[in-house]
Curated annotation (Swiss-Prot):
Homodimer. The keyword Cytoplasm applies. The reaction proceeds by a bi uni uni bi ping pong mechanism. It comes from Corynebacterium glutamicum (strain R). The gene is panC. It is an enzyme of class 6 (ligase). Keywords: ATP-binding, Cytoplasm, Ligase, Nucleotide-binding, Pantothenate biosynthesis. The lineage of its organism: Bacteria, Bacillati, Actinomycetota, Actinomycetes, Mycobacteriales. It catalyses: (R)-pantoate + beta-alanine + ATP = (R)-pantothenate + AMP + diphosphate + H(+). ATP binds at residues 26-33, 147-150, 176, 184-187. (R)-pantoate binds at residues 57, 153. Its EC number is 6.3.2.1. One of its GO terms (cellular component) is cytosol. One of its GO terms (molecular function) is ATP binding. This is Pantothenate synthetase. Beta-alanine binds at residue 57.
Length: 279
């Protein structure tokens, strides 16, 4: 496995490679990331993974505790990626990605990036889209792999490549869950044992809605919100039923008769967790 820390080294490493699959990450890797690599490995001659904690997608452009406290464990991440079968790792620092300071020209995500997660984290998806566009330009992948846990991110990136005619196929990969049902996330490392137990109310509420839909029962969305809002140690950010492609909220009156996605975010202590489930 080759590790490149500069753009030139990355471009040199990619010379003469055939089909390329890209797995963009911010590090602090877990089994969910390994599933992305597995999917990429099955469809491409060469698999590239990036590790970069992107300040543009954090509050105050990284001048915040969330950015400073984001887990960084490069040696462990490299070991996981090598075992998973990655060929090239791109692990730049901030100066390498944004030489001379933050960029003047950004990718702006419009309405799809300002609702739900974007409403709570202004500018977040502009930062995501900007760094992903840079990675696409550097790696020139045939396919790129993103976890379905970040459903809004997947929708934003799909619009990015469609609207800017970037020739890359976006491959969402299903959510990986721990045995207790919690969606795998790098942020889970910041939960205490008690906080992790409190966080389980999120997948429980989502799976409850899915069971009601499967049984042909009416969905009580406000009841689901109330359950999360009143759970011990939990603060509700949002829970909505949306169109899977556009993320536009769906108005339902009783039974749901069309494909839909429930997206939700909560805080457990200082840790923000997101999850979603298909209905």
């Amino acid at each position: 496995m080759q590790v490149a820390t500069t753009k030139k080294a990355l471009i040199d490493a990619l010379l003469h490679h055939k089909s390329v699959g890209l797995v963009p990450t911010m590090g602090a890797l877990h089994s969910g990331h390994a599933s992305l690599v597995k999917a990429a490995r099955a469809e491409n001659d060469t698999v590239v993974a990036s590790i970069f904690v992107n300040p543009l997608q954090f509050e105050a452009l990284g001048d915040c505790d969330d950015y400073r406290n984001y887990p960084r464990q490069l040696d462990a991440d490299l070991a996981l990626l090598e075992e998973a079968g990655v060929d090239i790792v791109f692990a730049p620092d901030v100066e390498e990605m944004y030489p001379g300071g933050l960029p003047l020209v950004w990718a702006r995500t419009g309405s799809i990036g300002t609702k739900l997660e974007g409403a709570s984290r202004p500018g977040h998806f502009d930062g995501v889209a900007t760094v992903v566009a840079k990675l696409f330009n550097l790696v020139r992948p045939d396919r790129a792999y993103f976890g379905q846990k970040d459903a809004q991110q997947v929708a934003v990136i799909r619009r990015l490549v469609a609207d800017l005619d970037i020739p890359v196929e976006i491959r969402p990969v299903p959510i990986i869950r721990s045995a207790d049902g919690l969606a795998e996330s790098s942020r889970n490392q910041r939960l205490s044992a008690d906080q992790r137990a409190q966080a389980l109310v999120l997948p429980q509420v989502l799976s409850g809605l899915q069971r009601r839909k499967a049984a042909g029962e009416a969905l009580d969305i406000q009841g689901a919100r109330d359950t999360l809002a009143s759970a011990d140690g939990v603060r509700l950010d949002h829970l909505e039923i949306v169109d899977p492609a556009t993320l536009e909220p769906l108005e339902i009156d009783g039974l749901l008769t069309q494909p839909a996605l429930v997206v939700a975010a909560i805080f457990v202590g200082p840790v923000r967790l997101i999850d979603n489930i298909e209905l």
